[in-house]
Curated annotation (Swiss-Prot):
SUPFAM superfamilies: Tetrahydrobiopterin biosynthesis enzymes-like (SSF55620). GO terms for biological process: queuosine biosynthetic process; tRNA modification. It catalyses: 7-aminomethyl-7-carbaguanine + 2 NADP(+) = 7-cyano-7-deazaguanine + 2 NADPH + 3 H(+). The gene is queF. This is NADPH-dependent 7-cyano-7-deazaguanine reductase.
């Protein structure tokens, strides 16, 4: 099925009974074809936070929690976000004898949709703390050149620095558009690398160039990862984006060249 057949951007009735059939998988293959030779492009995880998660206990009393879904980047499919929202809404009036029963059912349904092992972790509503970003913020730098669409030629090494570096950079200025609805997506992107020192102004210019780009969160992160890997040739690389929520969900894709560089998932203030 193509994304045009999904419920994104369409008026939809919200199910009030358990409805796993609403889940809409989207193949990762088409977006990855041009990155087939990029090391690590399918290595990492997609973390989703579910803020509108509710069900009934055995006494028919509503329960609430925050959920964290972990979807491996190796999965053949990602799950379209509106369908995931509808799926979780369909659980609002479903009775579960325990939290574990809920977890087991959700993991089964999402794993089937993604054709890979998906996990769910539950948090009390006041226990998922907000973290502060770590690393060097590059948002106050002045780019030499600005473009309105992603342009890998913006990426440059630092001509004045020959020594290798192990650096984590981040920017709050990531913006792209949903490819179906055209709605803006906002995020913070973290870039960690080892190798020849990058020109940080060029990286900021490259991030800003996504502001009119149409792409799903996961696809944007993989394009950023691929362009840095190809153009700047780091020894190791991590790209991790924490997007703001929409419809009670936020999406946080991470791609790494080395699994030892997988960060712990975080929640930032804008989420």
């Amino acid at each position: 099925m193509s994304v045009e057949q999904s419920l994104l951007g369409k008026e939809t009735e919200y199910p009030t009974t358990y409805s796993p059939s609403v889940l809409f998988p989207i193949s990762r293959d088409a977006a990855r074809e041009k990155y087939a030779q990029i090391e690590g492009i399918s290595q990492g995880k997609d973390w989703w936070h579910v803020f509108e998660l509710s069900w009934l206990n055995s006494d028919n009393i509503p329960q609430v929690a925050i959920g964290r879904i972990t979807l491996p980047a190796t999965s053949p499919y990602l799950i379209e976000s509106k369908s995931l929202k509808l799926y979780f809404n369909s659980l609002n009036f479903h009775v579960f004898a325990s939290k574990q029963e809920l977890i087991d059912l959700v993991e089964k349904d999402l794993s089937q949709a993604a054709n890979a092992k998906v996990s769910l972790e539950l948090f009390d509503v006041d226990s998922l703390e907000i973290s502060k970003p770590s690393g060097m913020c590059i948002d106050d730098l002045k780019p030499e050149r600005l473009e309105s669409h992603p342009d890998a030629s913006l990426l440059k090494l630092d001509a004045n620095e020959q020594h290798d570096a192990d650096v984590t950079l981040y920017s709050h200025l990531l913006r792209s558009n949903c490819p179906v609805t055209g709605q803006p997506d906002w995020g913070t992107v973290f870039i960690r690398y080892t190798g020849r020192k990058h020109c940080y102004r060029s990286i900021l210019a490259y991030i800003i160039s996504y502001r009119q780009h149409n792409g799903f969160h996961e696809q944007c992160v993989e394009q950023i990862y691929a362009d840095i890997w190809k153009n700047l040739q780091p020894e190791k690389l991590m790209v991790y984006a924490t997007y703001t929520r929409r419809g009670g969900l936020d999406i946080n894709p991470c791609r790494v060249s080395d699994l030892s560089w997988m960060p712990n998932p975080i929640r930032l203030a804008r989420q």
